[in-house]
Amino acid sequence: MKTIGEFNAAHGPEAIGLTDLAAVHWNLEAPRLYEEALRRNEAQLARGGALVATTGSHTGRSPKDKYVVRDAGTENEIWWDNNGSITPDQFATLLDDFRAHARGKELFAQDLFGGADPAHRVRARVYTELAWHSLFIRNLLIRPERADLAAYVPELTIIDLPSFQADPARHGCRSKTVIAIDFSQKIVLIGGSAYAGEMKKSVFTYLNYVLPGTGVMPMHCSANASLDETGDSALFFGLSGTGKTTLSNDSSRQLIGDDEHGWSRDGIFNFEGGCYAKTIRLSRNAEPEIYATTERFGTVMENVVIDPLTRVPDFDDASLTENTRCAYPLDFIANASATGRAGHPKNIVMLTCDAFGVMPPIAKLTGAEAMYHFLSGYTAKVAGTERGLTAPEATFSTCFGAPFMPRHPSVYGNLLRELMAEHGVDCWLVNTGWTGGGVGTGRRMPIRVTRRLLSAALDGSLAQVEFRRDPYFGFSVPVEVPGVETQVLSPVETWTNKAAFADTATRLVTMFRENFKRFESHVDADVRAAEPVAAAIAA
């Protein structure tokens, strides 16, 4: 077997049972990975220097094809209502078949870290059969110093073979696509999908499983911090496509990370060393920091259409998918944190993409309301972020990231509530979805409005304004905010048909109530009293 690059020879591919490989390219950096990806016709060059790849039929995650090995160690630890399972024997067969499929192939390996805090990080080795996948995951996770590679010993191993086709009868899955995690062996197998996001979310899922036991709260959120001497941080929870990356990229604040973080007794820390930003309808004027990364060597653009002659990206072209993305190292953002760490948050923002158009652009939550809305995780699945999703769909994704949370939501909710109370954190619910009507009749909340409201929340001025109680949801909504039209703050005033608004709001409240029934036995009376209808009746 030929080896190219630097690695710990005492812990090579044989340690995971990968044998008879044609070659392994170890820890290659961007220039070499560009060469390999272009030589293999895996990708193209865009004007400006980014590498552009397409992912075929899988242009988003495949959550229904994700499985956890159900064994003695996980039986009572995993939330099986939300996680598919396979047996240890089925996983063993799958792993053997992955090994057989890899024989004779050239693979690319990256030795990386998940977690900027050395006390709470995982050493993740990622094997891929595509060179551009290797660059993608190198961009997204944290890269060790080259001098440390010779002593690197992996804790978690990911094997990503898009050309592998699973056999449902043999492997216990439902299709030819499979994402299987064995927490006991610390192995992840990804087959039948070239969507690169599966790799990063597998690391996230692993950390979401192991960290709560150490008292660390893993979070599907972005984070930034003020540039002044206080350095106070803010967290932005939200499902993919709700604005986490866009809103945390603020030139007036330091970016900690755009998607995955931990909150320990020492503060917050990024799980990653890069960003994975949506690029559909990306604008140089509206999102200059992200736009600039698409014109840099080293960035990977996924399913972005480029002109066949000029190689200029067309960010308005959704012919491949709405879920177009770019992946780049965190240091491509000028104001990004060099450490990926910050102190305890002063503010938490829960982003919801309200597909009904009845929620206000911002609301202040009590501790109990924050717990309620965190467990509810109301949002809309935005087109393209999952396979087969072509239009926004109202949903409840508990913890604002149900597909990645292997444990019961109450584990994460209780940790969050405890940390919020301990550090006196203000919590805000922000609607980046629709206003003036639902999907098809209303319009998306203007980003300038969201940015203005967030600025007021983060600098402390919003907490000082007059608030009213929302008649449907019970939370506190600002009456006036300088620089924002008063009408926008009151959703009913943006609808021409007030009766239709009332009917729609009532329907959404009913959805909240039905969804939360599964959590009622896991929360106290204060959280149950934060239920929208209960709050409205009490008013």
From Swiss-Prot:
Q: Which organism is it from?
A: Methylorubrum extorquens (strain PA1) (Methylobacterium extorquens)
Locate the transmembrane regions by residue number. Answer: none
Residues binding Mn(2+) are: 201, 220, 259
One Gene Ontology biological process: gluconeogenesis
**A Pfam family matched by this chain, by name?**
PEPCK_ATP
The catalytic activity of this protein is classed by the Enzyme Commission as 4.1.1.49
Enumerate the catalysed reactions.
oxaloacetate + ATP = phosphoenolpyruvate + ADP + CO2
CC cofactor: Mn(2+)
Per UniProt, what is one GO molecular function of this protein?
ATP binding
Q: What does this protein do?
A: Involved in the gluconeogenesis. Catalyzes the conversion of oxaloacetate (OAA) to phosphoenolpyruvate (PEP) through direct phosphoryl transfer between the nucleoside triphosphate and OAA.
Residues that coordinate or bind substrate: 61, 195, 201, 325
Where in or outside the cell it occurs: the entry states: Cytoplasm
Q: Where does ATP bind?
A: 201, 220, 238-246, 287, 325, 450
Q: What is this protein called?
A: Phosphoenolpyruvate carboxykinase (ATP)
Q: Which domain of life is it from?
A: Bacteria
